Amino acid sequence: EDEDWVVVRGDGCTVYQGTTEVKREIRQTGLSGAMMGKGNHRHFMLKEIHEQPAVIGDTLQSYVDPATRTVALPALPFDWSKVSRITLTGCGGAFYVCMVAKYWFEQIARLPVEVELGSEFRYRAPPLPEGGVCIAVSQSGETADTLAAVRYAKAEKQTVLSVVNVPESAIARESH
């Protein structure tokens, strides 16, 4: 959890929040060391660029039924026809992803979209309309500024969705 810290010893670990010991459910991640390392690439960005075709293919495969040639997306906690505005937020490369997604949402879904830099969103504190949806984009799901943006959007009664690579991440847990 946010602001937890852990002491790891040979016989186990102890989790603290501040100076208080807390009990947390122990979960094992599905990620392997190979997935988290940069392999033979000079840096993580280059690794991610080279992984894009496989990642996109794996993602689409989970939603496409090859027998019927149809796409089946999971149910969302809102009705798209009642969405008053979409706010996209992210930092770094995720911010640029949001800028591209803005065009797609506006051109295809015909919904108004704002793109907010995660590090500025909560400080700028824009008014967010009732019935709005905030989509947070973060590769790790742990980007502190994007997490703060998620919390601001939730406080403003927005439905919050996230696009992350780590289902156990803080941003994923705090999204709807």
Segments predicted by a language model, with ranges:
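Glycine-rich phosphate-binding loops that contact phosphosugars or nucleotide phosphates
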Residues: S81-S175
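N-terminal segments that mediate ammonia production and transfer
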Residues: E1-S81, A94, E106-I108, Y123-P127
